[in-house]
Amino acid sequence: MFITGAFFDILEVGPKKIRRCFELVRVRFAPSPTGHLHVGGARTALFNWMFARKEGGKFILRIEDTDTERSSREYEQQILESLRWCGLDWDEGPDIGGDFGPYRQSERLEIYREYAEKLVEDKRAYYVVYDKEDPSKELFTTYEYPHEYKEKGHPVTIKFKVLPGKTSFEDLLKGYMEFDNSTLEDFIIMKSNGFPTYNFAVVVDDHLMRISHVFRGEDHLSNTPKQLMIYEAFGWEAPVFMHIPLILGSDRTPLSKRHGATSVEHFRREGILSRALMNYLALLGWRVEGDEIFTIEEKLQSFDPKDISNKGVIFDYQKLEWVNGKHMRRIDLEDLKREFIEWAKYAGKEIPSVDERYFSETLRICREKVNTLSQLYDIMYPFMNDDYEYEKDYVEKFLKREEAERVLEEAKKAFKDLNSWNMEEIEKTLRDLSEKGLASKKVVFQLIRGAVTGKLVTPGLFETIEVLGKERTLKRLERTLQFLKKT
């Protein structure tokens, strides 16, 4: 809750109760730009974003690019673009700045060096000098900067001194956690190349950026005791930690490429709506009351991080598609049209120029049969293109039948004589045709369906023909008859 603009919480840490006050909820998402945005990272960003927005706080984006070999600005831009597509905006970050920047770790090296040297001054860290020929071999340690050895080319790092005792904290999901310091050795906080290690950089950054809560994957749980030791060495108050169970594959191991696609970029390209992806990711671990199909904005005020499950959840690709299909049929037709056009441009798909009303009507009937924008494009293709191809199954199972030509000729004649072009009259015409004994109803309907679309699976046949219109339907029947005569 907020009292005079401050966020308070009370934690029980073992036998002690600690009351902490934060001027403002400040959370961060800090990806490493070494690849595309993983759906697990997107879910972590979502939970942080929802907490900040509900509590009137700030959501900070920080780029952790200290892995100089794997990090790239290209991946950074892709991550930012994926976050924007997900509908997640930030209040401070590398692209918009803020009061606590820079927001790229590679631009904060001098800050880390100064704080590491402060720990050396306080005897909580020390320099380590290594052999020039064998950089893995430690020569000696010292509290004085080894200028002479550094100038001679010896690698020099700074190590943090682990003190005896225990380190504990209260995790919002996992409860009281305690670690025996004897299980940890002194660890490097500044590498020989002048870059900080992960555990040191995040502590300095989170403190200086006034981060109040750290919500992250439980794969970071083992890092927490080291980070808490650094907080203690500086005399800083640690943020509230919450370690979220990982998203799992079907074999209950952490979701990875061996299970299938894992990047936000992939699902975007495949035609998943951003609102559907966020809906599904929210369902992965968050206990939501009511309808499971929703937009994040609809559920924002009911979000409580304590409602997140402490168990791992399996990523179900089919469930994601199902959720997406529900959203495609739920949203306003004009919104779907806009999203479809934007997706086609992103995926490199060409949409032919057609009448606006015809396009909308096609979209209306086709969205009922599919679950992704990619599938929507495929099913709409013959509506948008007169040079569609005939599916092999249509040709082999129906068009090569002896009665095919006569059925199509009769259909062409019946539609030509039809004065009122509406679904009721079209249905009556086709049912009358199927009762003439030319072929079974299924064969008649599938012959005509394939003739006007090239496909055996389409929206309802009567709707399809109504939307195609009389002129287009007659032309397509004639086109198929000409194709039949050539085969």
From Swiss-Prot:
GO CC term, one of those recorded: cytosol
Residues spanned by motif 'HIGH' region: 31-41
Main location: cytoplasm
Extent of motif 'KMSKS' region: 254-258
Keywords carried by this UniProt record: Aminoacyl-tRNA synthetase, ATP-binding, Cytoplasm, Ligase, Nucleotide-binding, Protein biosynthesis
Any one GO molecular function term: glutamate-tRNA ligase activity
Intracellular or extracellular location(s): Cytoplasm
Chain residues that bind ATP: 257
A GO biological process held by the record: glutamyl-tRNA aminoacylation
EC number: 6.1.1.17
Self-association state and partner proteins as the record states: Monomer.
Function: Catalyzes the attachment of glutamate to tRNA(Glu) in a two-step reaction: glutamate is first activated by ATP to form Glu-AMP and then transferred to the acceptor end of tRNA(Glu).
HAMAP family: Glu_tRNA_synth_type1
Name of the molecule in the record: Glutamate--tRNA ligase 2
The species this protein was found in: Thermotoga maritima (strain ATCC 43589 / DSM 3109 / JCM 10099 / NBRC 100826 / MSB8)
Underlying gene: gltX2
